[in-house]
Structure formats: C-alpha cells, structure tokens
C-alpha cells in the first residue's frame, strides 16, 4: 500500500466510515478506529464533537484540505448570498481537483490533486497546476495529450466504481470534461452522509 493510499485509509479509519465508498477500505472489515485503542466502545460525542467530526469528514473527503484553506473556503461561503452549507459544497465541488476526480480521469481525489499539480491538466486550453483552482460553469477541463497514456492505465478502476454526476459532462475517449453548473448538495454523489450545516455550526461557535 502506498503512502498516499495509507493516508486515505487512515482518514476512513479515523472517521469510522468508508467516506469514498472504496471496496478496499479497512472499515469494510471492522467498525472501530485506528490504533491499539480502536476497539474500545465509542463514547457519545458532545455537540462540539459532532460538529468537529462533520468538518473533519468533509475536508477529509476532498483530500484532507488544510485547516487554513478550508476555513477560507468556509469564510467565502458565508459571505455569499444564499444558504451557507449549499455555498460551501458548491465551492468545494468547483475545485479543479474535485472536477478531475468527478470526471473519472483518476480514481481518487488524492490522485486528482497530484495529477493537477504535476501539470497534466488544462482549463480552457491553458495548463493549470493548482488543485484548488476554482472552475466556473462552462469551463472545459482536458487532460494534456502527452498525459493521456497515464490516465488510460486506470480506466477500468475508474469506470467500475462511480458514475459521472450530471453537473459535469465528460468524454472519456478525448479525456475532456465540461463543468456544466455548480451543484446543489443534493446533486453531489457522496457515498456517505455529509452534514455541511454542522460545519457552519462549528465555525459559528
């Protein structure tokens, strides 16, 4: 198991949930957390604990976003008009690494970030190497011609595990995707229940 995979599964174990719906997740085989004390019965969480866990799960899902960056995303979501939890999810799903993941160009959000950071992706014909780059509706995301060989190796895994949501149009033959619209929370295909309203409560304390 690679270091990246180990980190990903560590998040699953910490949350006690298979947050990406991966068949190989260790929580599919056990219902306790990591470490020698993981088998102890879990105590009931306080309101703060529930809110913290919701925040950790959401930011973990998007590749364990650093706290400073996640807080900045939340701050922007709260400044925008409309429902803050919906705004938060919309901003997270507008990230370039999230779109590359949703489009099935790579098997995990961790791989998506690395793929973008290594310069394999273009947005509207321009190479972008920042995973947190925010895409707008209508943006065209494509894998560089010289990088398409890297993607096809993972094709069987990608296509077997999840569908492309309807707010993204993807052509897997050309390795091109269009970000159609910013999704609502109900549109996002999370394998587990996400509770962004609890994230709002956490930061509003």
Curated annotation (Swiss-Prot):
SUPFAM superfamilies: Alpha-L RNA-binding motif (SSF55174). Residues 1-46 are annotated as: Disordered. Keywords: Ribonucleoprotein, Ribosomal protein, RNA-binding, rRNA-binding. GO terms for cellular component: small ribosomal subunit. It comes from the Bacteria. InterPro entries: Ribosomal_uS4, Ribosomal_uS4_bac-type, Ribosomal_uS4_CS, Ribosomal_uS4_N, S4_RNA-bd, S4_RNA-bd_sf. GO terms for biological process: ribosomal small subunit biogenesis; translation. Residues 1-16 have a biased composition (Basic and acidic residues). Residues 94-157 form the S4 RNA-binding domain. Pfam families: Ribosomal_S4, S4. The keyword Zinc does not apply. GO terms for molecular function: rRNA binding; structural constituent of ribosome. Part of the 30S ribosomal subunit. Contacts protein S5. The interaction surface between S4 and S5 is involved in control of translational fidelity. HAMAP family: Ribosomal_uS4_B. One of the primary rRNA binding proteins, it binds directly to 16S rRNA where it nucleates assembly of the body of the 30S subunit. With S5 and S12 plays an important role in translational accuracy. Belongs to the universal ribosomal protein uS4 family. This is Small ribosomal subunit protein uS4. The lineage of its organism: Bacteria, Pseudomonadati, Pseudomonadota, Alphaproteobacteria, Hyphomicrobiales. The gene is rpsD.
């Amino acid at each position: 198991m690679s270091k990246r995979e180990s980190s990903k599964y560590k998040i699953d174990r910490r949350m006690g949930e298979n947050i990406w719906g991966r068949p190989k997740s260790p929580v599919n085989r056990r219902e306790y957390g990591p470490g020698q004390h993981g088998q102890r019965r879990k105590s009931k969480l306080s309101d703060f604990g529930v809110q913290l866990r919701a925040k950790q799960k959401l930011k973990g899902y998007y590749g364990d976003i650093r706290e400073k960056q996640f807080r900045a995303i939340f701050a922007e979501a709260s400044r925008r008009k409309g429902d803050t939890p919906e705004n938060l999810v919309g901003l997270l799903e507008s990230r370039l690494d999230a779109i590359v993941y949703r489009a099935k160009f790579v098997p995990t959000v961790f791989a998506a970030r690395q793929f973008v950071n290594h310069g394999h992706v273009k947005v509207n014909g321009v190479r972008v190497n920042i995973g947190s780059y925010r895409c707008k509706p209508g943006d065209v995301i494509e894998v560089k011609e010289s990088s398409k060989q890297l993607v096809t190796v993972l094709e069987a895994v990608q296509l077997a595990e999840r569908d492309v949501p309807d707010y993204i149009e993807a052509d897997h033959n050309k390795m091109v995707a269009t970000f159609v619209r910013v999704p609502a929370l109900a549109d996002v295909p999370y394998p587990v229940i996400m509770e962004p309203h609890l994230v709002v409560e956490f930061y509003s304390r």
